Amino acid sequence: MFVKKGDKVRVIAGKDKGVEAVVLKAFPKINKVVVEGVAIVKKHQKPNNENPQGAIVEKEAPIHVSNVQVLDKNGVAGRVGYKVVDGKKVRYNKKSGEVLD
């Protein structure tokens, strides 16, 4: 998967299209990522010791990795490629050529 935790991404599809934010979690097995402030859902929690009345909590839901595009340091969105630099495999932005790792 081309997106990692901590990457700055732009959402390119869905109700939050155009939002630029940071990836909080990545789930490579299911090709999904959790992006800060994107795909907010309301989760109903049962009463417990911490919250005796229960609550409705808002949290980020995972979105498919195909709906995001990685940004480089200059904010240029592009596809991600891989190349070997000094014996290490690194990710780079195919549009700008800038190394992401």
Swiss-Prot record:
Keywords on record: Ribonucleoprotein, Ribosomal protein, RNA-binding, rRNA-binding
Family membership: Belongs to the universal ribosomal protein uL24 family.
Species of provenance: Streptococcus mutans serotype c (strain ATCC 700610 / UA159)
Name of the gene this protein is made from: rplX
SMART domains in alphabetical order: KOW
Alphabetized InterPro entries for the sequence: KOW (IPR005824), Rib_uL2_dom2 (IPR014722), Ribosomal_uL24 (IPR003256), Ribosomal_uL24_CS (IPR005825), Ribosomal_uL24_KOW (IPR041988), Translation_prot_SH3-like_sf (IPR008991)
Role of this protein: One of two assembly initiator proteins, it binds directly to the 5'-end of the 23S rRNA, where it nucleates assembly of the 50S subunit. One of the proteins that surrounds the polypeptide exit tunnel on the outside of the subunit.
Entry keyword annotation includes RNA-binding: yes
SUPFAM superfamilies: Translation proteins SH3-like domain
BP term (GO), one: translation
Name of the protein described by the UniProt record: Large ribosomal subunit protein uL24
Lineage of source species: Bacteria, Bacillati, Bacillota, Bacilli, Lactobacillales
